[in-house]
A protein has these predicted regions:
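N-terminal Rossmann NAD(P)H-binding glycine-rich loop of SDR-like oxidoreductase domains
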Residues: 4-26
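NAD(P)H-binding glycine-rich loop region in Rossmannoid oxidoreductase-like domains
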Residues: 50-97, 101, 105-108, 123-125
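Short-chain dehydrogenase/reductase
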Residues: 92, 96, 131, 142-150, ...
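Conserved Rossmann-fold NAD(P)-dependent oxidoreductase catalytic core, especially the SDR/UDP-sugar
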Residues: 97-144
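Active-site Tyr-X1-5-Lys
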Residues: 140-168
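NAD(P)-dependent short-chain dehydrogenase/reductase
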Residues: 160-169, 173-213
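Mid/C-terminal beta-alpha module of Rossmann-like enzyme folds, strongest
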Residues: 214-233
């Protein structure tokens, strides 16, 4: 039986939604979206898998049997004014334990490729002037979110080494566009109110990617390519 289905987590999120839009436009493979609780997809008509929570105890039995590729973009992201007593533990519960639980069950179900949407935060918060991050840099995350993504990457490499499932890890930079939230949205609001921002006095550069093009940066091009011999980046 030929397996050609893509299972996408985080489809209601900003980046996950952009990935879903891209996959629907390409119409190369059937897509099933994973959503939590009563969340709804924005103007998308695809089969949906509903889960109550996403952590190390989530049961995926039967939901991955037809999947050839899992694209995992669901995550606990930056929380403004986080009230968790232990933010790192909260991030680990979803981003590490939830990710590795999904990956192990995906491998056991016969999924051939697992694409993990990580974050440039794994690399750190800044480089020396005139240099850019590379995939070979030593990870230096500086906050709980980045640490959790790094630990998930490390665990996924172990899963790749222990199973026949290929793991692809992508670290997107800041993604912007319609529906963006957090600090980027705050800056847009300040600008709309005419509040000047001191960019001219700051000698700094930061890479950005438009939401409309974030799907390729999240590894979608790897979905349609032949399986490679490398199981981790």
């Amino acid at each position: 039986l030929m397996r050609n289905q893509i299972v996408l987590t985080g489809a209601t999120g900003f980046v996950g939604g952009a990935i879903l839009d891209r996959l629907q436009r390409e119409k190369k493979y059937p897509v099933t979206a994973v959503v939590r609780g009563d969340s709804s997809l924005r103007a998308s008509v695809v089969p949906v898998i509903r889960i109550g929570s996403f952590d190390g105890d989530t049961q995926w039995q039967g939901n991955l049997d037809e999947a050839d590729v899992v694209i995992h973009s669901a995550a606990r992201v930056h929380v403004m004014n986080d009230v968790e007593s232990d933010p790192l533990a909260a991030f680990r519960k979803v981003n590490v334990e939830g990710t590795l639980n999904l990956a192990r069950q995906a491998a056991a179900s016969g999924v051939r490729r697992f694409i993990f949407v990580s974050s440039i935060k794994v690399n750190g918060e800044g480089t020396t002037p005139g240099t850019a991050y590379t995939a070979d840099d030593i990870p230096a995350p500086a906050d709980p979110y980045g640490i959790s993504k790094m630990e998930a990457e490390e665990g996924l490499r172990e899963v790749a080494a222990q199973t026949s499932m290929e793991v692809v890890i992508v670290r997107p930079v800041l993604v912007y566009g319609p529906g963006v939230k957090a600090n980027f949205l705050n800056m847009m609001r300040w600008l709309s109110k005419g509040i000047p921002l001191p960019f001219g006095a700051i000698h700094n550069r930061r890479s950005l990617v438009a939401g409309s093009s974030s799907a390729p940066s999240a590894g979608i091009s790897r979905v349609t390519s032949p399986l490679t011999s490398a199981k981790a980046p």
